[in-house]
């Protein structure tokens, strides 16, 4: 486990929920500045229920429509 203290290790990655309210773009920029390689979370498997989101009613995910043409992409890919 190479995750920082208070981060949740899962499937070889590290997850952390931040409680500050932010717009989606601001949240993604916050993640990128927080630590190199960080992004909003991606859900890899269809129907995956990420345990890092349990107990939180609203979280941002890293899925976006960069080109504004309904071709959705994950920010970490």
UniProtKB/Swiss-Prot annotation:
It comes from the Eukaryota. Expressed by the venom gland. Disulfide bonds join 3-14. Its main location: secreted. Signal peptide: none annotated. Lectin that displays hemagglutinating activity on all types of trypsinized human erythrocytes (A+, B+, AB+, and O+), with a higher sensitivity to AB+ type. Is inhibited by different carbohydrates with alpha-lactose displaying the most potent ability to block agglutination (followed by D-fucose, D-galactose, D-rhamnose, D-mannose, and D-sucrose). Is also inhibited by EDTA and pretreatment with heat. In addition, it induces significant cell death in HL-60 cells in a dose-dependent manner, with an IC(50) close to 250 ug/ml. Is a calcium-dependent lectin. Homodimer; disulfide-linked. This is C-type lectin galatrox. The lineage of its organism: Eukaryota, Metazoa, Chordata, Craniata, Vertebrata.
